[in-house]
């Protein structure tokens, strides 16, 4: 009987990428297949996030629930990976003695060896070292499950924002060699991938050697240009970028590379210079707006999403008003916004915070309501327009329909003959938008042809 692995992912897209790699590693080494049901699993892994306290505590809550599964199935192995693992290390085993494996983001490739050691010794295995970029040399080729794929181009972050735990859990910035990234993208394209999302904690800080050991360095703009030249790749996205690293070279790339989508996730975190300085973000609101102004001069249709932290220590009503003014001016399409959560070991955790939680919650609700109004307005403005979408597969709500994404990352569901589904999935097609819902669009296919290539550029 085929053994199975269950992975639960918390947090960012980097973690989603890492979770896929955990499955790939265990499939290549032990033949394990992925399952979505923990009760069916022989190995249960939690890929964790420590950016906010709530996410961290959720991990231990979930661990408590799977403990019962282990009691009923003694051979079951339980592992904790990701940023909580890096931060807590062996203390996870002290708190939850039934955990067998603790590994960081940089050591997931060692999972087969850790499993062997656990079985041989009967003792929990902990490996949260930072072996730089070593893991990419030991990962098996990716198994593609659709026309879109993530590609990690670097690890870590060297910005050390005062509130952020990432540099301590993922290490400083280390870029993969250019040829290594391009080889992975080309392999994905050969398997039918048409859209890649380049991943990194601070992706536009990419500085990769042209090849392993080379002294010549490629910047992020160069990487994008090379990826765009790979046959089969039709769209390029990236996340997450940092305003401080947004060079003129990268801005110019939006004029030179049509495959780079007109959608940008650029976290600003706050709209007050005073708070940005306390956060150690390294830019002002004016500098941030200058980047967006230059980009929209090249791509007037650029849609923009961001991250916002409400209730940072010392935030006044005036600071919050400045944040809201920026939200209105930038017309954000989406915002991942949260109340500030102090993380142990970060400088901001020691700052005095005298703002009542109910005030923070009220501000967050106001911010999120404003963003939702923006989302609805932008979605409504798309009704009646023809959008180019990448067809990803059957619709979740109705498998008789198909679903795809626009450049600005909107999900579009549309009817299509069942016989055409295999041909259309993975293709770039034109869809007329007929209706806007809160979190998706509905459209109609404009072109149906017996020749799949007729539905693409």
Swiss-Prot record:
<dbReference type="InterPro" id="IPR005839">
    <property type="entry name" value="Methylthiotransferase"/>
</dbReference>
<dbReference type="InterPro" id="IPR007197">
    <property type="entry name" value="rSAM"/>
</dbReference>
<keyword id="KW-0963">Cytoplasm</keyword>
<comment type="subunit">
    <text>Monomer.</text>
</comment>
<feature type="binding site">
    <location>
        <position position="161"/>
    </location>
    <ligand>
        <name>[4Fe-4S] cluster 2</name>
    </ligand>
</feature>
<dbReference type="InterPro" id="IPR006463">
    <property type="entry name" value="MiaB_methiolase"/>
</dbReference>
<feature type="domain" description="MTTase N-terminal">
    <location>
        <begin position="3"/>
        <end position="120"/>
    </location>
</feature>
<keyword id="KW-0808">Transferase</keyword>
<comment type="similarity">
    <text>Belongs to the methylthiotransferase family. MiaB subfamily.</text>
</comment>
<dbReference type="GO" id="GO:0046872">
    <property type="term" value="F:metal ion binding"/>
</dbReference>
<dbReference type="InterPro" id="IPR006638">
    <property type="entry name" value="Elp3/MiaA/NifB-like_rSAM"/>
</dbReference>
<dbReference type="InterPro" id="IPR038135">
    <property type="entry name" value="Methylthiotransferase_N_sf"/>
</dbReference>
<keyword id="KW-0411">Iron-sulfur</keyword>
<dbReference type="GO" id="GO:0005829">
    <property type="term" value="C:cytosol"/>
</dbReference>
<comment type="function">
    <text>Catalyzes the methylthiolation of N6-(dimethylallyl)adenosine (i(6)A), leading to the formation of 2-methylthio-N6-(dimethylallyl)adenosine (ms(2)i(6)A) at position 37 in tRNAs that read codons beginning with uridine.</text>
</comment>
<feature type="binding site">
    <location>
        <position position="12"/>
    </location>
    <ligand>
        <name>[4Fe-4S] cluster 1</name>
    </ligand>
</feature>
<dbReference type="InterPro" id="IPR023404">
    <property type="entry name" value="rSAM_horseshoe"/>
</dbReference>
<keyword id="KW-0479">Metal-binding</keyword>
<dbReference type="Pfam" id="PF04055">
    <property type="entry name" value="Radical_SAM"/>
</dbReference>
<keyword id="KW-0004">4Fe-4S</keyword>
<feature type="domain" description="TRAM">
    <location>
        <begin position="380"/>
        <end position="447"/>
    </location>
</feature>
<dbReference type="InterPro" id="IPR020612">
    <property type="entry name" value="Methylthiotransferase_CS"/>
</dbReference>
<protein>
    <recommendedName>
        <fullName>tRNA-2-methylthio-N(6)-dimethylallyladenosine synthase</fullName>
        <ecNumber>2.8.4.3</ecNumber>
    </recommendedName>
</protein>
<dbReference type="InterPro" id="IPR013848">
    <property type="entry name" value="Methylthiotransferase_N"/>
</dbReference>
<feature type="binding site">
    <location>
        <position position="157"/>
    </location>
    <ligand>
        <name>[4Fe-4S] cluster 2</name>
    </ligand>
</feature>
<dbReference type="Pfam" id="PF01938">
    <property type="entry name" value="TRAM"/>
</dbReference>
<dbReference type="GO" id="GO:0051539">
    <property type="term" value="F:4 iron, 4 sulfur cluster binding"/>
</dbReference>
<feature type="binding site">
    <location>
        <position position="164"/>
    </location>
    <ligand>
        <name>[4Fe-4S] cluster 2</name>
    </ligand>
</feature>
<keyword id="KW-0819">tRNA processing</keyword>
<keyword id="KW-0949">S-adenosyl-L-methionine</keyword>
<dbReference type="Pfam" id="PF00919">
    <property type="entry name" value="UPF0004"/>
</dbReference>
<keyword id="KW-0408">Iron</keyword>
<dbReference type="GO" id="GO:0035597">
    <property type="term" value="F:N6-isopentenyladenosine methylthiotransferase activity"/>
</dbReference>
<feature type="domain" description="Radical SAM core">
    <location>
        <begin position="143"/>
        <end position="377"/>
    </location>
</feature>
<dbReference type="InterPro" id="IPR002792">
    <property type="entry name" value="TRAM_dom"/>
</dbReference>
<feature type="binding site">
    <location>
        <position position="49"/>
    </location>
    <ligand>
        <name>[4Fe-4S] cluster 1</name>
    </ligand>
</feature>
<feature type="binding site">
    <location>
        <position position="83"/>
    </location>
    <ligand>
        <name>[4Fe-4S] cluster 1</name>
    </ligand>
</feature>
């Amino acid at each position: 009987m085929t053994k199975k692995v269950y992975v639960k992912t918390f947090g960012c897209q980097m973690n989603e990428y890492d979770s896929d790699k955990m499955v790939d590693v265990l499939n290549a080494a032990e033949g394990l297949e992925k399952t979505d049901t923990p009760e069916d699993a022989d190995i249960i892994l939690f890929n964790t996030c420590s950016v906010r306290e709530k996410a961290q505590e959720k991990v231990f809550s979930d661990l408590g629930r799977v403990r019962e599964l282990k009691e009923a199935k003694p051979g079951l192995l339980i592992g904790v990976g990701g940023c909580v693992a890096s931060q807590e290390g062996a203390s996870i085993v002290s708190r939850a003695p039934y955990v067998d494996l603790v590994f960081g983001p940089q050591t997931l490739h060692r999972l087969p060896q850790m499993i062997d050691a656990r079985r041989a010794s009967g003792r929990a295995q902990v490996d949260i070292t930072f072996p730089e970029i070593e893991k990419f040399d030991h990962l098996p080729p990716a198994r593609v499950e659709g026309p879109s794929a993530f590609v990690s181009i670097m690890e870590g972050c060297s910005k050390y924002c005062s509130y952020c735990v990432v540099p301590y859990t993922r290490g400083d910035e280390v870029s993969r060699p250019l040829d290594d990234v391009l080889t992975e993208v080309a392999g994905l394209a050969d398997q039918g991938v048409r859209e890649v999302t380049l991943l990194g904690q601070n992706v536009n800080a990419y500085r990769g050697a042209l090849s392993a050991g080379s002294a010549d360095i490629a910047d992020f703009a160069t990487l994008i240009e090379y990826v765009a030249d790979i046959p089969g790749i039709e769209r390029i996205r990236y996340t997450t970028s940092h305003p401080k690293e947004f060079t003129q070279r990268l801005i110019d790339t939006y004029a030179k590379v049509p495959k780079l989508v007109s959608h940008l996730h650029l976290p600003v975190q706050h709209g007050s210079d005073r708070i940005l300085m306390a956060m150690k973000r390294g830019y002002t609101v004016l500098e941030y707006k200058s980047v967006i102004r230059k980009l929209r001069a090249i791509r007037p249709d650029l849609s923009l999403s961001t991250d916002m932290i409400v209730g940072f220590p010392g935030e006044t009503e005036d600071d919050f008003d400045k944040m809201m003014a920026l939200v209105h001016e930038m017309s954000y399409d989406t915002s991942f916004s949260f109340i500030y959560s102090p993380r142990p070991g970060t400088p901001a955790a020691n700052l005095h915070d005298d703002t009542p939680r109910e005030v923070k919650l009220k501000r967050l609700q106001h911010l999120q309501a404003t963003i939702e109004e923006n989302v609805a307005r932008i979605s409504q403005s798309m009704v009646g327009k023809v959008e180019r979408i990448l067809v990803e597969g059957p619709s979740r709500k109705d498998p008789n329909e198909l679903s795809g994404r626009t450049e600005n990352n909107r999900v579009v569901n549309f009817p299509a003959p069942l016989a055409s589904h295999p041909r259309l999935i993975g293709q770039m097609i034109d869809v007329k938008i007929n209706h806007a819902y809160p979190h998706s669009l509905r459209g109609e296919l404009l072109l149906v042809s017996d020749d799949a290539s007729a539905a693409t550029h």
